[in-house]
Amino acid sequence: MAEQGYDSITIDLQHGLVGYEVATTMLQAMRASAVTPLVRVPWLDPAAIMKSLDAGAYGVICPMINTREEAERLVSYVRYPPNGVRSFGPTRANFSAGSDYGQHADREVLCFAMIETAEAVANLEAITSTPGLDGVYIGPADLTLGLTGRRYPTGFDREEPEVVEVIQTILQEAHKAGIRACLHNGTPAYAAKAIGWGFDLVTISNDVRLLAGAAQASVATARKLIDEQVSPLPASATEGY
């Protein structure tokens, strides 16, 4: 995946089916490429955040940040004193980023808060203005659930005007605060549309959907080509059987 032209790749420890040990080997593999490795942590948990950074992640995406206080805690877990409370123990980061990692980590490690609830939207200005926060990352599926309940089917690429309006408001508030606006997408087409709106970071899809989509397309193409090449035997060839 890291060799396919992506700017960054996110290891998903929230909804993904991997744990810390596997994530560490994935970070090791990405080290040979030019991609920026990010980790979406399971929750606002200092241990998960700090261990992900110690393993060599260059940024964390934290789900369900709903208040300024939670955003401040997130930043504090990502930054070393005096900017935060991150414990020093960059077991692998020291090797991947240099023995002076502790001196420049705070300037390089990215900290993204996920906005995906009605509460977070209500506290948007307070969250986006949190010192040390690099950006907000919209989770459109949970955001739609939080704003509208089960009125609409779940999914990523939202077209409902009321949801799109909130997504664009989050984008505007992030840029007003001077931080990055990021959006999770399900398709390249919607990702391109989001870039057109002004988003700084977008996803195209996840590995499971990419694999399933490619497999489905390959099977469909093979069946179509086979059907075109194989024609029924003429009636004379089947006489006597």
Question: Which residue stretches match the model-derived regions?
Answer:
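Expand to "…catalyze enediolate/carbanion chemistry for C-C bond making/breaking, isomerization
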Residues: M1-Y241
